[in-house]
Amino acid sequence: MRKQERDALNMTLIALACALLMVLPLVTTFDDLLTAWALQLGVNNPLQAIVPVESRMVVGLLSAVGIKAAASGSHMVVWDGAGSMHVLLISWNCIGWQSLVLLGASFISGLRGHQPLEARVQVVLIGAAGTMLLNLLRVAAVAALAATWGQTAAVLFHDYGGTLLVVGWLFAFWLFVQRWILPADPSDQPELATT
């Protein structure tokens, strides 16, 4: 890679990092607003029913990378290298439902236009599956950080790193979708002059 290409890549990465940091307060505030609405509507009870299933899936992911973990209901236990046990509580608000709401909101603007139904279905399925997988990986990362680096690192990642992951995922998802799944709208193409 030439120096000019490397410099362009570095500037792009810096610009993306700045964009993510600028969006972070907006997304965090939006998540808090969604949480308040969910509590008022009573959505927290059905979401809490999902927590034990997600906890067991996270334990499976952690076991796959060699971290000893166990789950019981909404509690999860991870052991560090010294054999000390760390208890984590996974609540209805930690499972990532807000990221699915953000994804749904992005569908409203991202699927405007005249795309074929097949492409729209692919976008929705890939987006939902990717977001759910990201949420599992995010919770597993919090647990792994608690087991390896301690509670402070896990809390910081839970509060801020997870939000950055979701925003980064949405950017990457829409770049991928626009490039490879959604066909270009013919009205966006420049017209050729005919004589």
What are these regions (language model features)?
Residues 1-195:
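Hydrophobic N-terminal alpha-helices or hydrophobic patches in metabolic proteins across all domains
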